[in-house]
Amino acid sequence: YGVKMKGNLAIMFNGIKSGWFPPLPETFNKRSMICINDLIDAILLIASDGRTNGRIYIATDGHQYSSRDIYKAMCLATGKNIPIWVTPKFVFSLLAWIGDIVKYIPFNSHRYKKIFGNECYSSVELHKLGFTPKYDLFSYLKKYGKSVAENN
């Protein structure tokens, strides 16, 4: 995440900002994320630390977010109220099934998995090098939400 979000995050953010993205239910899935500013710091640390010796590192902000958490953070950043109602998960399942059959619909099982699947990783090895992220999604959007909203 960052001021200029890309891909699915940008679609979700713009959908929330425009009012067409449906409120996600809490499914307790787990997703890892990192702020672009922290990712750059991690890359510079890895590139300059002799202990890395060509190893591969995973960089996260250390938090596990559900898709509902991400939805709520984006609502706050766009100044939208978090709806008290949610769209049931089965509605998304049905839409994904229809999208798999009717190819021109922009929502299918691939997008469904992107929203409700787990993508959770550990950056313990990177922390051993001394990496500490400066942001989590909520603190970043609280500080820079207006800039994010203007640039997406």
Regions found by a protein language model. Name each.
Residues Y1-V3:
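Conserved beta-loop-beta element that borders a ligand/cofactor-binding pocket
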Residues M5-I11, P25-A47, G54-R55:
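Substrate-positioning beta->alpha
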Residues G7-G15, K72-M74, D100:
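Short, glycine/charged-enriched secondary-structure capping and boundary segments
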Residues A10, N37-I40, S66-D69, V124, ...:
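Residues in well-ordered alpha-helical elements
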Residues F13-L24, K80:
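A short C-terminal helix-loop "cap" of Rossmann-like NAD(P)-dependent dehydrogenase/epimerase domains
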Residues I36, L95-T132:
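Conserved C-terminal active-site "lid" loop/helix of NAD(P)H-dependent oxidoreductases
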Residues L45, D49-F107, Y135-N152:
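Mid/C-terminal beta-alpha module of Rossmann-like enzyme folds, strongest
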